[in-house]
Curated annotation (Swiss-Prot):
Keywords (A to Z) from UniProt: Crown gall tumor, Plasmid
UniProt key word Mitochondrion: no
UniProt protein name: Protein virC2
InterPro entries: Ribbon_hlx_hlx, VirC2, VirC2_C_sf
Length: 202
């Protein structure tokens, strides 16, 4: 078998090689380049949306300081109170027009209870301002056996400081029983009520 000659000579092959255009590698698509970069998350977690701890702490401290200031300015402590057992007798006729009118509709006990409730409220204010020391302590009572047997009993809560002041005035030696002291206190409260009533009507 014979050797075939190349169709192109060496010189022609070199000229063809020089005339070929250079192979240009295409650049990567933009989408491909961008896909290699880290993308920010589309949705933030709840922890990412929370405020910075330092800011939250400052806000909490400010609110707490405001609350402490308000509490310091307001007094929420109620005064200590004590229960006092009270008793009183109805007044004699014409001592109190209010009582005389009430017994036309209610029993003597019920009528005196209605007045005593009001009298004790007023007398508590007198204990607070000290005016009870110059006020009357008693009033005329009936002399009949039936009317003497009527005794109204009740109880009321008083501030301890006011009861101490009343005891020093009505029982300076501290020898009275609790019920005896309560009778004096209720009698004085009614005496003040009847005295004011008479002064208003005169």
């Amino acid at each position: 078998m014979g050797i075939r000659k190349p169709a192109l000579s060496v010189g022609e092959a070199r000229r063809l090689a020089a005339a070929r255009p250079e192979i240009v590698h295409p650049s990567l698509p933009v989408a491909t380049q961008n896909s290699t970069l880290p993308q920010p998350p589309e949705n933030l977690d709840e922890e990412d949306r929370r405020p910075a701890p330092a800011t939250a702490k400052r806000c909490h401290s400010s609110d707490q300081q405001s609350m402490l200031t308000v509490d310091a300015l307001s007094s929420t402590t109620a005064p200590e109170k004590i229960q006092v057992f009270l008793s009183a007798r109805p007044p004699a006729p014409e001592v109190s027009k209010i009582y005389d009118n009430l017994i036309l509709q209610y029993s003597p006990s019920k009528s005196l209870q209605m007045i005593l409730r009001r009298a004790l409220g007023d007398f508590e204010n007198m204990l607070a301002d000290g005016s009870f020391r110059a006020a009357p302590k008693s009033y005329p009572i009936p002399h009949t056996a039936f009317e003497k047997s009527i005794i109204v009993q009740t109880s009321r809560m008083f501030p301890v400081s006011l009861i101490e002041a009343a005891r020093n005035h009505f029982d300076p030696l501290g020898l009275e029983t609790a019920r005896a002291f309560g009778h004096k206190l209720a009698t004085a409260a009614l005496a003040c009520f009847f005295a004011r009533e008479k002064a208003t009507n005169s």
